[in-house]
């Protein structure tokens, strides 16, 4: 797992192109998609999940209405790629917990579908 808050880390480890950040902003579906693809390639894994968002609380960079914004991207063997935007309620820790739950739930759903195909 890689946690990359700073744009330079998203570029270096998530293999996000700087032009994507410049065009779409650091918190965006496009950046999250590139991170999922980049981490998958970097680790040669079957599944990668990336998250990107604003857990909160508001600060000088983000307003309170942006708190709880979350983008999640999943890359399953390069066959299924999904990116979704969520608006989660609650404080910072609650938003983070919910983000983890949603990400892992989607991963589990994919794995169950793959197991059904194998049987």
Residue ranges, per PLM feature:
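Short alpha-helical segments enriched in small residues
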Residues: 1-119
């Amino acid at each position: 797992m890689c946690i990359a808050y700073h744009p330079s880390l998203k570029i270096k480890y998530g293999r996000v192109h700087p032009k994507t950040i410049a065009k779409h902003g650091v918190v965006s579906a496009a950046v999250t998609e590139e991170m999922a693809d980049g981490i998958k390639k970097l680790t040669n894994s079957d599944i990668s999940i990336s998250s990107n968002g604003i857990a909160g609380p508001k600060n000088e960079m983000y307003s309170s209405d942006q708190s709880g914004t979350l983008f999640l991207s999943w890359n399953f063997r390069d066959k299924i790629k999904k990116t979704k935007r969520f608006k989660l309620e609650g404080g910072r820790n609650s938003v983070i917990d919910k983000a983890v739950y949603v990400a892992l739930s989607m991963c589990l759903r994919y794995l169950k579908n793959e197991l059904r195909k194998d049987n």
